[in-house]
């Protein structure tokens, strides 16, 4: 298992893998991994030559700074959990600056009104933050396939809408 912290590093690796015609599966996470995440990783390993797991607590999807500060950051534990699945996992654990530079802001997206329903009523800008990080991570990792849990159905639908609207990859 190799952990990359810089997008330039992961870009180099991805370009090399793509030049070998290998398929890349991607499981974006905010860490604090559990069995649901591991099942996505296992599925990705079955369906792709390579699997990349990102572990990144995204500040733009938190509307409350306190919630962001309290969010668990358990990289060592997460890596050990991933090792129980396979040693052939690439981990991308960037810093906020690596992903956003000095401008930590969200892009604005239209999700066919989904962003204003359910959770979106109470967390203004949350889904713009989700859309921003998913788009940025896809641009960095350049996966063929991506895997998302279904526990948060609204977020899954938001991501599916983003992928469709921007003509991104298969999820």
Language model region names:
Residues 15-62, 67-70, 118-130, 137-138:
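N-terminal catalytic cores of NTP/NDP-binding nucleotidyl/phosphoryl-transfer enzymes
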Residues 141, 146-154, 164:
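Acidic, metal-binding active-site segment of PIN/NYN-like and related structure-specific nucleases
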Residues 69-147:
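Divalent-metal (Mg2+/Mn2+/Ca2+)-assisted nucleotide/phosphate chemistry catalytic cores
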Residues 1-22:
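Positively charged, low-complexity intrinsically disordered leader regions
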Residues 169-171:
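Conserved small/polar residues in nucleotide/adenosyl-binding loops
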Residues 29, 55, 94-95, 150:
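Short secondary-structure boundary segments
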Residues 38-46, 78-79, 84, 163:
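Short amphipathic alpha-helices and their capping/turn segments at secondary-structure boundaries
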């Amino acid at each position: 298992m190799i952990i990359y912290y810089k997008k330039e590093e992961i870009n180099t690796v991805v370009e090399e893998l793509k030049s070998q015609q290998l398929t890349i599966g991607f499981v974006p996470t905010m860490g604090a991994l559990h069995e649901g995440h591991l099942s996505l990783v296992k599925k990705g390993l079955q369906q792709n030559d390579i699997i990349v797991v990102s572990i990144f607590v995204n500040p733009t999807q938190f509307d409350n700074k306190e919630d962001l500060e309290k969010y668990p950051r358990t990289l060592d534990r997460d890596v050990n959990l991933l090792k129980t699945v396979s040693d052939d996992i690439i981990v991308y654990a960037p810093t906020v600056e690596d992903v956003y530079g000095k401008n930590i802001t969200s892009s604005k997206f239209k999700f066919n009104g989904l962003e204003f329903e359910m959770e979106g009523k109470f967390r203004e800008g949350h889904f713009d933050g989700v859309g921003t990080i998913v788009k940025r991570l896809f641009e960095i990792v350049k996966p063929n396939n991506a895997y998302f849990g279904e526990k948060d159905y609204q977020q899954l639908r938001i991501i599916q809408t983003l992928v469709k609207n921007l003509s991104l990859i298969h999820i």
